[in-house]
From Swiss-Prot, chains A, B:
SUPFAM superfamilies, per database record: HisI-like (SSF141734)
Gene Ontology biological process terms, A to Z: L-histidine biosynthetic process
Enzyme class: hydrolase
Binding positions (Mg(2+)): D73, D75, D77
Gene3D superfamilies assigned to the protein according to its UniProt record, in alphabetical order: 4.10.80.70, Phosphoribosyl-AMP cyclohydrolase (3.10.20.810)
Name of the molecule in the record: Phosphoribosyl-AMP cyclohydrolase
NCBIfam families reported for this sequence: PRK00051.1
Task performed by this protein: Catalyzes the hydrolysis of the adenine ring of phosphoribosyl-AMP.
Subcellular compartments: Cytoplasm
Length: 123, 123
């Protein structure tokens, strides 16, 4: 495994890309343990800065990400998880978190109703 | 324009994606002015944390990025620049900065010799 440069409290940014469609689904952060768990289990793990803990994508929603390859950038301070996404990546119900242009035009496809998946208390 | 949440010294992470091949080319940071310049000129601008200034991709190498669309994520704290890349995105000469797997296997394609483009003093 290449040495990684973790920063900002031991975190590394992770770009999540659909391995078939090449769509960018989301961006999140991982710490060293989350990267190791992702490698060893084949299921995407991240670190939540707000909840201050590791989370497995899909643990609440069922929208897991099966990780095929992990890529590293030239500076070794950013990763790509190439994934097979169950359901949708975004907690809003869109397939990708990047469902709008900077001008506010919605271009994404809504896959599920977040109230039904996460309940009314949010994600 | 959607309101953006800049953090870490007024910066927002930018994922750069080839608009045709959907390949993720690099990740960089932008401040508000860099985003505005990108919008108004159609050429990708970023903010260099080490040099503490705005830079236009390609200003030294000639490897400009013509920006088609800019996408925003659900939290409005991450962007995608969809670009048409001249030459290669990575200063190492590879088309994408993500030219290796986490295991250190090179999967990317080298497009240019960095010494010829940037000189021997680095980028």
């Amino acid at each position: 495994m290449l040495p990684l440069k973790f920063h900002e409290g031991g975190l590394i940014p992770v770009i999540v890309q659909d391995q078939k469609t090449r769509e960018v689904l989301m961006m999140a952060y991982a710490n060293e343990e989350a990267v190791r768990l992702t490698e060893s289990t084949g299921s995407a793990h991240y670190y939540s800065r707000s909840r201050k803990k590791i989370w497995k994508k899909g643990e609440e929603s069922g929208h897991f990400q099966k990780v095929g390859r992990i890529l590293v950038d030239c500076d070794e301070d950013c990763l790509i998880y190439e994934v097979e996404q169950t359901g949708a990546a975004c907690h809003t119900g869109y397939r990708t978190c990047f469902y709008r242009t900077l001008d506010g035009v919605t271009i994404g496809e809504k896959i599920f109703d977040p109230e039904k998946v996460y309940g009314k208390t949010g994600h």
